[in-house]
Amino acid sequence: MRPLPGAPGVAAAAALLLLLLPRARSDEHEHTYQDKEEVVLWMNTVGPYHNRQETYKYFSLPFCVGSKKSISHYHETLGEALQGVELEFSGLDIKFKDDVMPGTYCEIDLDKEKRDAFVYAIKNHYWYQMYIDDLPIWGIVGEADENGEDYYLWTYKKLEIGFNGNRIVDVNLTSEGKVKLVPNTKIQMSYSVKWKKSDVKFEDRFDKYLDPSFFQHRIHWFSIFNSFMMVIFLVGLVSMILMRTLRKDYARYSKEEEMDDMDRDLGDEYGWKQVHGDVFRPSSHPLIFSSLIGSGCQIFAVSLIVIIVAMIEDLYTERGSMLSTAIFVYAATSPVNGYFGGSLYARQGGRRWIKQMFIGAFLIPAMVCGTAFFINFIAIYYHASRAIPFGTMVAVCCICFFVILPLNLVGTILGRNLSGQPNFPCRVNAVPRPIPEKKWFMEPAVIVCLGGILPFGSIFIEMYFIFTSFWAYKIYYVYGFMMLVLVILCIVTVCVTIVCTYFLLNAEDYRWQWTSFLSAASTAIYVYMYSFYYYFFKTKMYGLFQTSFYFGYMAVFSTALGIMCGAIGYMGTSAFVRKIYTNVKID
């Protein structure tokens, strides 16, 4: 039997996407245990408290490991590998429901080099993270005395593990045994395990890590209410102004239709009707413009789907699951990019559709991978756990070439064939109409700069909560708020760009495509400016790696947000422009 065309590529794509999905392995992933069954304590990373993303392998500090036989851990998902999860076996002997009395599990032979490493870690407030049954545990490395002359290491890990039936539902760590760091001495590391019955349900075991008092604060509710009221006011204002203004315009244009040619020539003709022969003229640089619109539509689809999935599933309970889900959804929604970008490029008369398809497919991945590649050099120099392994890079490249590109090609072909024919309500003139002079505040550059203020105002409070959950130590879980804010952002963006475009066309300037896109996309400029304020006034980050990581990925986030807002603004404005020129009689 002859194999189907493209079958090897489909098989390779399926295998690559399986990397994004968690693999089942042992009872740790079933989250059920038998009495006396082994429970693994994984050591993850260690790093400065104020630099959340600057993390290193736990055993990069001269900690000792327990005597139990080592267990290897592999990255279960692509999200884990990209987020720098580096689980290493602690060597501690822990069994389900089996208490362990205080005892030594290893000994550190503290020479001067090891002492200096611990002192540096304590000076920089290093903390470490561990996992038991996918439940995170945090601890501090040590502390200094009031004078900052003597340094102490916490040597005793006191674990209290709560269980409900055959499941682990709670883990607490108490650090004790403060020992002064003195060169050429031996430090004994010890631990104990106490099991206790708990009434906490397995489904609710992550509730203790959430912070309702922070995310459901009155300010958060007030900001949502304030943004919602702004939407109602803005929609009402835009509707009233445009309906009244357009009604007058239609009446004036109808009156002009009743005039004879002499009266019409002597009349004072002005307004958006005068550019009917140029308003549907292709935008400048249609290849780039179409690719941006397609990418923006895909980012919106990804945002919408991921938020819905996060509302249904508690993605924060699994390491790297949010990032893995986002990558999977981005790859799966590639036809959206191809469809909207390819159809728009075809309607604008573009002929290099293959080049447009490639640019649309790789625009966002190239931006993200380029930034990650730059930061990866710094991470490698720092020997940080955030350094992306070579195998992970290869996997990401394969996803781009064997999943995203073919799906984008499918979307492009569908877009060109289903909605690629121009169907404008007005005929485009052969010769472009000269653009008259206008007041300075009607210039496209000014409109672009001002267009992002209101959309940013509708989301900047939510930006604080999102930033805090990513750059600080909060778990974002109120995705219902995020969905509402996304809807508000879309409505405000469309309303603002429609008003901006109306005034631009009324000034007889038909360059509305890029203006509508950029005026909506300028929201990204204000978000990035806000990230500077957040960095300097809301965090205590320091160092080259953390600073590069912060501003690098904030630039990626802001750019992606801007492309999404620009696409939303253009799509809404395009429908508006088509509507008003459909309803007016053109000779």
From Swiss-Prot:
Glycans are attached at N172, N417. Residues 1-26 form the signal peptide. The chain crosses the membrane at residues 222-242, 292-312, 326-346, 358-378, 387-407, 447-467, 480-500, 517-537, 549-569. GO terms for cellular component: membrane. Keywords: Glycoprotein, Membrane, Signal, Transmembrane, Transmembrane helix. It is a multi-pass membrane protein. It is found in: Membrane. Pfam families: EMP70. InterPro entries: EMP70 (IPR004240). The keyword Isomerase does not apply. Belongs to the nonaspanin (TM9SF) (TC 9.A.2) family. This is Transmembrane 9 superfamily member 3. The lineage of its organism: Eukaryota, Metazoa, Chordata, Craniata, Vertebrata. The gene is Tm9sf3.
